[in-house]
C-alpha cells in the first residue's frame, strides 16, 4: 500500500505514489500577496482621507470625498471587479495580482475612511485643544495626538476591511483570474482561496 500523504503534501498537491487532487497552497500564497499589496495602499490612504473628513466636514471637496466614499461602500463587488478590469486589466493586457490587489484596495478604502472619521469625531475636543495650546499645528496634533488616541477604532476598521475583502470572489474573477501554480509574480495571473473554493465547487475532481 502507498503511504498516506502528509497534510503538507496534500495541501501542496505533491505526488505521493499517485497524484493528489486539490491543494490550496497556491491560493494561500496568492491571497497573502494580493492582500498585502492592497493593505499597503488602502490603510494610509483610508486614514488620511478619514482624518481629512473629520477635520474639514464643511469643505466642498471633503463633501465630495464623503459622497464618493459612500458610493464606493455601496457598490457591489462584481461592479468593482468590472471597473478594475477596464481600468487595469485592459491597459496591462492581461490578468495579474496587481489588478486583483487594486480591486481589493478599492473595496477596503471606504471602510477604513469611515472608521477613522467616526473615531476621530468622538475623541474629546480637549485633546486637540491641548495639543494646539502647546504650540503644535493642526497636522502635528493630528499625527502625534489624535491618531494615536484613535488607534483602537482605526485598527478595528482595518480588520473589518480585511475581513470583507479576504472572502471576495467576484472581483478577482475579473482581475486575478486564478492559477494552478504557486506564483510570486505580481504581473501574472494568480490564485486566491475564494477562487479555489469556486473552482472546487464547479469541478469536484480538482
Task: Give names to the regions the model predicted.
Residues 3, 13-16, 22, 172-206:
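Interhelical loop and adjacent transmembrane-helix boundary motif
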Residues 21, 25, 29, 61-65, ...:
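Alpha-helical membrane-protein architecture signal
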Residues 21-37, 62-73, 85, 89, ...:
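Alpha-helical membrane-interface segments at transmembrane helix boundaries
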Residues 38-69, 82:
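Transmembrane-helix boundary motif in ABC transporter permease subunits
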Residues 39, 138-175:
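Transmembrane alpha-helices
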Residues 70-105:
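Generic hydrophobic transmembrane alpha-helix motif, especially the helices
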Residues 76, 134-135, 148:
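Glycine/proline-centered hinge or cleavage motifs at structural transition points of membrane proteins
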Residues 114-132, 140-147:
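Intracellular coupling helices
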Amino acid at each position: 500500500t502507498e503511504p498516506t500523504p502528509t497534510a503538507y503534501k496534500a495541501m501542496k498537491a505533491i505526488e505521493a505514489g499517485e497524484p493528489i487532487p486539490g491543494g490550496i497552497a497556491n491560493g494561500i500564497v496568492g491571497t497573502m500577496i494580493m492582500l498585502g499589496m492592497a493593505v499597503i495602499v488602502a490603510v494610509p490612504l483610508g486614514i488620511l482621507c478619514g482624518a481629512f473628513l473629520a477635520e474639514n466636514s464643511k469643505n466642498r471637496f471633503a463633501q465630495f470625498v464623503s459622497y464618493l466614499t459612500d458610493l464606493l461602500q455601496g457598490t457591489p463587488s462584481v461592479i468593482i471587479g468590472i471597473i478594475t478590469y477596464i481600468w487595469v486589466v485592459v491597459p496591462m493586457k492581461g490578468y495579474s495580482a496587481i489588478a486583483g490587489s487594486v480591486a481589493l484596495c478599492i473595496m477596503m478604502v471606504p471602510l477604513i475612511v469611515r472608521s477613522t472619521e467616526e473615531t476621530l469625531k468622538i475623541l474629546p475636543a480637549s485633546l486637540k485643544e491641548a495639543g494646539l495650546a502647546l504650540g503644535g499645528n493642526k497636522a502635528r496634533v493630528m499625527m502625534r495626538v489624535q491618531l494615536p488616541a484613535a488607534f483602537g477604532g482605526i485598527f478595528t476598521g482595518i480588520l473589518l476591511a480585511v475581513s470583507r475583502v479576504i472572502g471576495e470572489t467576484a472581483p478577482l474573477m475579473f482581475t486575478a483570474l486564478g492559477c494552478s501554480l504557486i506564483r510570486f509574480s505580481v504581473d501574472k495571473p494568480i490564485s486566491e482561496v475564494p477562487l479555489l473554493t469556486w473552482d472546487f465547487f464547479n469541478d469536484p475532481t480538482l
